[in-house]
């Protein structure tokens, strides 16, 4: 898939693939501390839909917004960026 056509996508690393058709993706971002100015890494975890259970822990993937698939899952994996 072409990432240019996606409305919103994020790139992150898969940290869990234990559930059926679901992966947990950690998205890291860099922020500057408001007082001290140090660059800090903040992260957030998203559950994403993996239809064919083809992605493994350590893979870097792009995820895109989708309709709600379950209570906590409203993202889907659109392509692998780097295979571990």
Curated annotation (Swiss-Prot):
InterPro entries in UniProt: NA-bd_OB-fold (IPR012340), Ribosomal_uS17 (IPR000266), Ribosomal_uS17_bact/chlr (IPR019984), Ribosomal_uS17_CS (IPR019979)
Keyword annotations of the record: Ribonucleoprotein, Ribosomal protein, RNA-binding, rRNA-binding
Keyword RNA-binding in annotation: yes
One Gene Ontology CC term in the entry: cytosolic small ribosomal subunit
GO-annotated molecular function: rRNA binding; structural constituent of ribosome
Top-rank taxon, per record: Bacteria
Disulfide topology: none
GO-annotated biological processes: translation
Role description: One of the primary rRNA binding proteins, it binds specifically to the 5'-end of 16S ribosomal RNA.
Sequence similarity: Belongs to the universal ribosomal protein uS17 family.
Alphabetical list of PANTHER family matching this protein: 40S RIBOSOMAL PROTEIN S11 FAMILY MEMBER (PTHR10744), SMALL RIBOSOMAL SUBUNIT PROTEIN US17M (PTHR10744:SF1)
NCBIfam families in alphabetical order: PRK05610.1, uS17_bact
HAMAP family, alphabetized: Ribosomal_uS17_B
Complex and partners: Part of the 30S ribosomal subunit.
Protein's name in the database: Small ribosomal subunit protein uS17
Organism: Nitrosomonas eutropha (strain DSM 101675 / C91 / Nm57)
């Amino acid at each position: 898939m072409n990432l240019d056509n996606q409305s919103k996508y994020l790139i992150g690393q898969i940290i869990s693939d234990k559930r059926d058709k679901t992966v947990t993706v950690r998205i890291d971002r860099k922020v500057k501390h408001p007082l001290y100015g140090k660059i800090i890494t903040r992260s957030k975890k998203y559950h994403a839909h993996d239809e064919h259970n083809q992605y493994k822990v350590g893979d870097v993937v792009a995820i895109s917004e989708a309709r709600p698939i379950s209570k906590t899952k409203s993202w889907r994996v659109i392509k692998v960026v780097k295979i571990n």
